[in-house]
UniProtKB/Swiss-Prot annotation:
Entry's family note: Belongs to the YbaB/EbfC family.
UniProt gene name: ybcG
Native species: Lactococcus lactis subsp. lactis (strain IL1403) (Streptococcus lactis)
Role played: Binds to DNA and alters its conformation. May be involved in regulation of gene expression, nucleoid organization and DNA protection.
Subunit structure: Homodimer.
Location (main, coarse): cytoplasm
Protein name listed in UniProt: Nucleoid-associated protein LL0120
GO cellular component: bacterial nucleoid; cytosol
UniProtKB keywords: Cytoplasm, DNA-binding
Keyword Secreted: no
Gene3D superfamilies reported in the protein's UniProt record: Nucleoid-associated protein YbaB-like domain (3.30.1310.10)
Any one Pfam family match given in the protein's UniProt record, by short name: YbaB_DNA_bd
Cellular location(s): Cytoplasm, Nucleoid
Length: 99
């Protein structure tokens, strides 16, 4: 019986640690950039877009595709940073679990 109680306490402790890690990630700002920093985005760790900055010299009405590509690159850069940090901070909680 004591073993089960010990396991429950350990599970609760891990749950609290995981919650703290999730909050740390959510409160972190991630900055994604395109080539030459012409487009910059900021996301919170919960993947909410906070800002989008586009340098005026990249805005060309004759070539919207370049701007679209730069925005996509900046967004993907930030999202991959979030994914990497999430895996680093939360991956330790799921190692060895059967799912």
């Amino acid at each position: 019986m004591m073993n089960m109680q010990s396991m429950m306490k350990q599970a609760q402790k891990l749950q609290k640690q995981m919650q703290v890690s999730q909050e740390e990630i959510a409160n972190t700002t991630f900055v994604g950039k395109s080539a030459q920093d012409l487009v910059t985005v900021e996301f919170s760790g919960d993947r909410t877009l906070k800002s989008l900055d586009i340098k005026p010299d990249v805005i060309d009405p004759e070539d919207p595709e370049t701007l679209q590509d730069m925005v996509t690159d900046a967004v993907n850069d930030a999202l991959s940073q979030i994914e990497k940090v999430t895996e680093q901070k939360l991956g330790k909680f799921t190692k060895g679990l059967p799912f």
